[in-house]
Swiss-Prot record:
Reaction(s) catalysed by this chain's protein: UDP-N-acetyl-alpha-D-muramoyl-L-alanine + D-glutamate + ATP = UDP-N-acetyl-alpha-D-muramoyl-L-alanyl-D-glutamate + ADP + phosphate + H(+)
The name this protein goes by in its record: UDP-N-acetylmuramoylalanine--D-glutamate ligase
Domain of life: Bacteria
UniProt lineage: Bacteria, Bacillati, Bacillota, Clostridia, Eubacteriales
Gene from which the chain derives: murD
Listed InterPro entries: Mur-like_cat_sf (IPR036565), Mur_ligase_C (IPR004101), Mur_ligase_C_dom_sf (IPR036615), Mur_ligase_cen (IPR013221), MurD (IPR005762)
Family: Belongs to the MurCDEF family.
Disulfide bonds: none
GO molecular function list: ATP binding; UDP-N-acetylmuramoylalanine-D-glutamate ligase activity
Coiled coil feature spans: none
Native species: Desulfitobacterium hafniense (strain Y51)
Residues binding ATP: G114, T115, N116, G117, K118, T119, T120
Pathway this chain belongs to: Cell wall biogenesis; peptidoglycan biosynthesis
Amino acid sequence: MNLHEKKVLVVGAGRSGLAAVKRLKALGARIVLTDQKELAQLSGISELGLPDGQLVLGHIPQWHEVASEVIVLSPGVSPKLPFIQEGIAQGALIWSEVELALRDHPAFKIGVTGTNGKTTTTTLIGELAKRTGRPTLVAGNIGVALSDQVEDLDGEGIIVAELSSFQLEWVDSLRMNVGILLNVTPDHLDRHGTLDNYLAAKARIFEKQSPSDCAILNWDDARVRALAPHLKARVVFFSPTSLLAEGYGVRGDEVVLAEGGKITPIIARGELQLRGSHNLENIMAAIAAVRELGLSWEEITQGLRDFKGVEHRQEVVGTYEGILFINDSKGTNPDASEKALYAFEEPIVLIAGGKNKGLDFHDFMKTIKKQVKSLVLVGTAAAEMEQAAKDTGIQNYLRAGTFAEAVELAIAEAEPGDVVLLSPACTSWDMFKSYEERGEFFKELVRRHYREPI
């Protein structure tokens, strides 16, 4: 669709919304930007150069105020808002900012989705893709809005996009040359309602693929594996736990590729800097993706050896008085935090809690009972988590009134040889703007406690 002179409504004036406006201006669209926050509460609006008549701010609008042919939704905006529902009824198209950025872009596009591991996988693919010498953009749900960046790339470029279920929910004609679905476990059920709806949103990454494209799937995840017969693209499987007849798997301590009856060793686990068996999912998916770019095994293995991981994902803060501190603030659901718990053999003092996303904590507490020496709970979900801990028979837990108190309690519980792990299993939105802010504050508190210069 040519958007020149088309009226387009952008809902949400955060990072994605502002990037969408800039992209739409370049495409010659007639833009209306709406956000329920007042102008004084928003940043970056004046730089857009939109006249007052194109800004509808400070309230949730009626459809007649913002009626448009296309609605571009920011990821955090609920499509159930009445004016959006009326727009759908009136025939307006709904796109995510990702759809706007990538729908007609000529670059080679690699999309990564899944409940957990997206950011690590996306970042690793980006680092490996740069070894091709081609211009490479890493963006999406990873913190850089795609619409802000894509104009600088042509058909020689590579785009590696982390894609959330919110972003994929409203794609229309977006086609990924390589689509990756890492795993699916209950998450964002407050938005999607059911696990089936959540999976359906994730699976849209494959919807417009053709037989010349590649779909990379986790063999070990039954829900993900079951998608394979329904996909048009060539399917490549990976398994972090077994040797597959065809695909990426493990043989002893090695990551290998089984293909056409031949097994090719790729790298030994001991050569990798990423800890935890769950990171094998991320590594195998990344290998499969960059093989589509024609990288040699030597280039891939050197890139894997060099990769140290991503900030706020099992990030080593430091060892102080014999205690190892790990920042896993990106663990925003129980499944992600469970994987972090299995990454360490040392006794663990766990800091958990924050804002729940409508998820149950009882299975998580069963893992905590096996893997955790002491549990410190904080945030609005603390009472719910405490009840689940009691129901599971956990006795060694503490409640903190503030995040700073939680860190001090964890330090007091820990002994030399222990790990103090921040992996909250909840979002940060009750106390912080983002998981990044939470992780930075954790690191600051630890260093301040041990009087290390910040």
